[in-house]
UniProtKB/Swiss-Prot annotation:
Family listed: Belongs to the bacterial ribosomal protein bL34 family.
GO biological process, one term: translation
Protein name: Large ribosomal subunit protein bL34
InterPro entries (UniProt xref): Ribosomal_bL34, Ribosomal_bL34_CS
Single GO term (MF): structural constituent of ribosome
Keywords: Ribonucleoprotein, Ribosomal protein
Species of the source: Nitratidesulfovibrio vulgaris (strain DSM 19637 / Miyazaki F)
Cellular-component GO terms for this entry: ribonucleoprotein complex; ribosome
Length: 45
């Protein structure tokens, strides 16, 4: 039996998927732009 791959950590989540991390790169900003255009309630995390 293999272990579960998702081991939640709030710190890791914020540092990799947070809004400020997204805004720090051009591609990250593109992600936010796409999610705004789609009408997502949560843009990041």
């Amino acid at each position: 039996m293999s272990k579960r791959t998702y081991q939640p950590s709030k710190i890791r989540r914020k540092r990799t998927c947070g809004f400020r991390v997204r805004m720090s790169t051009a591609n990250g900003r593109a992600v936010i732009r796409r999610r705004r255009a789609k009408g997502r309630k949560r843009l990041a995390l």
